[in-house]
Amino acid sequence: MRLFLSLPVLVVVLSMVLEGPTPAQGVLDVSNPFDVLEEFGKTLEDNVREFINLITQSELPAKTRDWFSEIFGK
Protein backbone atom coordinates (compact mmCIF):
# COMPACT_ATOMS: atom_id res chain seq x y z
CA MET A 1 0.00 0.00 0.00
CA ARG A 2 2.78 2.41 0.88
CA LEU A 3 4.54 1.66 -2.39
CA PHE A 4 1.46 2.86 -4.24
CA LEU A 5 1.65 6.10 -2.27
CA SER A 6 5.39 6.61 -2.61
CA LEU A 7 5.53 6.19 -6.39
CA PRO A 8 3.27 9.21 -7.10
CA VAL A 9 5.30 11.24 -4.60
CA LEU A 10 8.48 10.31 -6.48
CA VAL A 11 6.89 11.37 -9.78
CA VAL A 12 5.84 14.72 -8.32
CA VAL A 13 9.31 15.35 -6.88
CA LEU A 14 11.00 14.48 -10.16
CA SER A 15 8.63 16.73 -12.11
CA MET A 16 9.35 19.60 -9.72
CA VAL A 17 13.09 19.10 -10.11
CA LEU A 18 12.97 18.82 -13.88
CA GLU A 19 10.57 21.68 -14.63
CA GLY A 20 13.24 24.32 -14.12
CA PRO A 21 13.17 27.73 -12.47
CA THR A 22 9.93 29.67 -12.17
CA PRO A 23 9.78 33.29 -13.35
CA ALA A 24 9.97 34.52 -9.74
CA GLN A 25 13.32 32.79 -9.30
CA GLY A 26 14.85 34.52 -12.29
CA VAL A 27 17.72 33.34 -14.40
CA LEU A 28 20.75 31.81 -12.71
CA ASP A 29 24.21 33.11 -13.50
CA VAL A 30 25.51 30.36 -15.74
CA SER A 31 29.19 31.23 -15.53
CA ASN A 32 30.07 27.55 -15.38
CA PRO A 33 27.51 25.00 -16.59
CA PHE A 34 29.14 22.30 -14.49
CA ASP A 35 28.13 24.17 -11.33
CA VAL A 36 24.49 23.86 -12.36
CA LEU A 37 24.95 20.14 -13.05
CA GLU A 38 26.70 19.66 -9.71
CA GLU A 39 23.86 21.40 -7.86
CA PHE A 40 21.29 19.30 -9.75
CA GLY A 41 23.23 16.14 -8.89
CA LYS A 42 23.34 17.02 -5.19
CA THR A 43 19.63 17.78 -5.14
CA LEU A 44 18.83 14.55 -6.93
CA GLU A 45 21.12 12.62 -4.57
CA ASP A 46 19.35 14.06 -1.53
CA ASN A 47 15.93 13.21 -2.96
CA VAL A 48 16.96 9.65 -3.81
CA ARG A 49 18.52 9.10 -0.37
CA GLU A 50 15.34 10.36 1.28
CA PHE A 51 13.24 8.04 -0.90
CA ILE A 52 15.45 5.02 -0.12
CA ASN A 53 15.32 5.79 3.61
CA LEU A 54 11.54 6.01 3.37
CA ILE A 55 11.40 2.57 1.75
CA THR A 56 13.84 0.94 4.19
CA GLN A 57 11.96 2.31 7.20
CA SER A 58 8.60 1.05 5.95
CA GLU A 59 7.06 -2.22 7.04
CA LEU A 60 6.89 -3.60 3.50
CA PRO A 61 10.33 -5.32 3.42
CA ALA A 62 9.72 -7.04 6.76
CA LYS A 63 6.24 -8.19 5.77
CA THR A 64 7.53 -9.47 2.42
CA ARG A 65 10.38 -11.37 4.09
CA ASP A 66 7.98 -12.92 6.61
CA TRP A 67 5.58 -13.90 3.84
CA PHE A 68 8.33 -15.61 1.81
CA SER A 69 9.61 -17.39 4.92
CA GLU A 70 6.11 -18.61 5.69
CA ILE A 71 5.39 -19.80 2.14
CA PHE A 72 8.73 -21.45 1.37
CA GLY A 73 9.46 -22.63 4.91
CA LYS A 74 6.76 -25.28 4.69
Swiss-Prot record:
Residues 1-26 form the signal peptide. InterPro entries: ApoC-1_sf, ApoC-I. One of its GO terms (molecular function) is phospholipase inhibitor activity. Keywords: Lipid transport, Secreted, Signal, Transport. It is found in: Secreted. One of its GO terms (biological process) is negative regulation of lipid catabolic process. Pfam families: ApoC-I. GO terms for cellular component: high-density lipoprotein particle; very-low-density lipoprotein particle. Belongs to the apolipoprotein C1 family. Apolipoprotein C-I is present in acidic (APOC1A) and basic (APOC1B) forms in P.paniscus, P.abelii and P.troglodytes and perhaps also in baboons and macaques. The two genes for ApoC-I arose through a duplication process that occurred after the divergence of New World monkeys from the human lineage. In human, the acidic form has become a pseudogene sometime between the divergence of bonobos and chimpanzees from the human lineage and the appearance of the Denisovans. Pseudogenization resulted when the codon for the penultimate amino acid in the signal sequence was changed to a stop codon. This is Apolipoprotein C-I, acidic form. It comes from Colobus guereza (Mantled guereza).
